[in-house]
């Protein structure tokens, strides 16, 4: 394009009927000649450039059909939270589904794959200091572990197969933060839309990990300045404007939720010894 941004022939957005997908749809207008919207549920209200596809990406053949003619992917589909700690359900949707998506993308010659990862990939790092993108994974639970797998698979596809891969460790995606922890980990709808579009339109890159958070002055995570610059992500919102409403909403001092970055997700079902976690 004349302004230097990338333009794609067909962009695939999975999980398009979900909370994040519904926000991204209007933000992605004009980034591709056609935008394919995939979800388990029907996708309504199609714009002229949009096309819909319904199906379960963990079922045989669905990922391949979704990838037909696609050159850029935003993969949001999957179970978006701990799902009651059901590892089998999370494995099927988030591990098997993501594996099939990367395999289908590779076979179809997809150039760029943007993967919705999570801050819960690093949840069992002790709270009190920011966690960078190069530190080892310490997932909060089965959901976080599934996202670690997705990031690892993305790294493999970038290094071995030359696919451009961006992993977005999305924080608390809400209209406004709901507790004190989210004063550092919140991402606004506006900033999430900007981040996705920047990743789609950016010039060539290899492999990036970016924390999907707003410009929160109480930032919990960091080390991604170069990756943000590579795509041009400059968040505009700051959770601090909500601080007086929610900074008192916090777990008891010394609790598992207070001691680790993953908060309540780390605490749910916890039966270990927190003093042994360094």
What are the residue ranges of the model-derived segments?
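Conserved C-terminal active-site "lid" loop/helix of NAD(P)H-dependent oxidoreductases
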Residues: 208-210, 217-234, 238, 245-275
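Alpha-helical substrate-binding/gating segment
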Residues: 170-176, 186-207, 215
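NAD(P)H-binding glycine-rich loop region in Rossmannoid oxidoreductase-like domains
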Residues: 44, 50, 55-93
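Conserved Rossmann-fold NAD(P)-dependent oxidoreductase catalytic core, especially the SDR/UDP-sugar
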Residues: 100-138
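N-terminal Rossmann NAD(P)H-binding glycine-rich loop of SDR-like oxidoreductase domains
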Residues: 8-30
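Catalytic helix-loop patch of NAD(P)-dependent Rossmann-fold dehydrogenases
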Residues: 92, 126-162
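NAD(P)-cofactor binding segment of oxidoreductase domains
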Residues: 73, 85-113
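Conserved catalytic Lys-bearing alpha helix of Rossmann-like short-chain dehydrogenase/reductases
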Residues: 95-101, 110, 146-154, 192
């Amino acid at each position: 394009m004349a302004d230097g941004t990338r333009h794609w022939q067909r962009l695939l957005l999975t999980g398009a009927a979900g909370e994040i997908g519904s926000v991204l749809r209007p933000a992605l207008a004009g980034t591709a000649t056609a935008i394919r919207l995939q979800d388990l549920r029907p996708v309504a209200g199609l714009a002229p450039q949009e096309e819909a596809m319904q199906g379960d990406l963990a079922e045989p053949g669905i990922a391949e059909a979704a990838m037909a003619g696609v050159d850029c992917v935003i993969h949001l589909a999957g179970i978006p939270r701990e799902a009651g700690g059901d590892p089998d359900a999370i494995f099927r949707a988030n591990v098997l589904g993501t594996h099939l998506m990367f395999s289908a993308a590779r076979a179809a010659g997809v150039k760029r794959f943007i993967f919705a990862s999570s801050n819960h990939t690093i949840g069992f790092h002790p709270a009190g200091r920011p966690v960078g993108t190069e530190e080892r994974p310490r997932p909060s639970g089965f959901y976080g572990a599934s996202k670690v797998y997705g990031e690892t698979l993305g790294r493999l596809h970038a290094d071995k197969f030359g696919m451009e891969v961006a992993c977005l460790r999305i924080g608390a995606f809400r209209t406004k933060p709901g507790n004190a922890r989210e004063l550092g980990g919140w991402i606004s709808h506006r900033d999430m839309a900007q981040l996705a579009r920047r990743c789609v339109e950016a010039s060539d890159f290899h492999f990036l990990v970016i924390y999907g958070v707003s410009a929160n002055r109480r930032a919990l995570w960091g080390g991604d300045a170069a990756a943000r610059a590579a795509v041009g992500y400059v968040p505009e919102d700051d959770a601090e404007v909500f601080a007086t409403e929610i900074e008192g909403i916090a777990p008891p001092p010394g609790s598992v939720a207070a001691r680790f970055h993953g908060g309540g997700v780390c605490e749910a079902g916890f039966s270990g010894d927190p003093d042994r976690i360094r």
